[in-house]
């Protein structure tokens, strides 16, 4: 099983590449790698990024977004990694701007996926907050690849386009016994300041 850290976004709202912002003395991407490594669940951690940032990452293989699908958001990153590593039975996808992710949350989601993958033939298992799925903290089956490819060929690069056309299910973030906001995206500098307090 492989983990994909999505780190190719433009970070326009944040004002600088979020992957290299720091929390507790570690860059966001390093923080996520530390959590993923600690779990001994993943045989490889892959960073999906763009050509400009690719050489800046250390500690994991970097796959640059497929040239024909550059600048098409998270789907482009997932597609580019899946296309190269199609033999993996499952991919855990995490956005780099979610540096508070915990091993407990990932383990709970994995158990949910395993319990439902055969009976319900799940392709995507992820978290949701209320009625809002969080497709950038989710497990993806390689079965999603053709659907992602079709989405990238269309004019709709939204994650919703994919999870509405696959067998997907979501567990609420509140089901994880953790009082931190481990699932929160850091979109603005003030978001980072608020979690440092």
From Swiss-Prot:
Known function: Transfers a GMP moiety from GTP to Mo-molybdopterin (Mo-MPT) cofactor (Moco or molybdenum cofactor) to form Mo-molybdopterin guanine dinucleotide (Mo-MGD) cofactor.
Localisation: Cytoplasm
Lineage, highest ranks first: Bacteria, Bacillati, Bacillota, Bacilli, Bacillales
Required cofactor(s): Mg(2+)
Pfam family, one: NTP_transf_3
Protein name: Probable molybdenum cofactor guanylyltransferase
EC number annotated for this UniProt entry: 2.7.7.77
Reactions catalysed: Mo-molybdopterin + GTP + H(+) = Mo-molybdopterin guanine dinucleotide + diphosphate
Domains (record comment): The N-terminal domain determines nucleotide recognition and specific binding, while the C-terminal domain determines the specific binding to the target protein.
GO biological process, one term: Mo-molybdopterin cofactor biosynthetic process
Protease among keywords: no
Residues the record lists as binding GTP: 6-8, 18, 65, 97
Binding site for Mg(2+): 97
Keywords for the protein's UniProt record, in alphabetical order: Cytoplasm, GTP-binding, Magnesium, Metal-binding, Molybdenum cofactor biosynthesis, Nucleotide-binding, Transferase
Gene source species: Staphylococcus carnosus (strain TM300)
Record-stated family: Belongs to the MobA family.
Cellular component annotations (GO), alphabetically ordered: cytoplasm
Molecular function terms from GO: GTP binding; metal ion binding; molybdenum cofactor guanylyltransferase activity
Keyword presence, Aminoacyl-tRNA synthetase: no
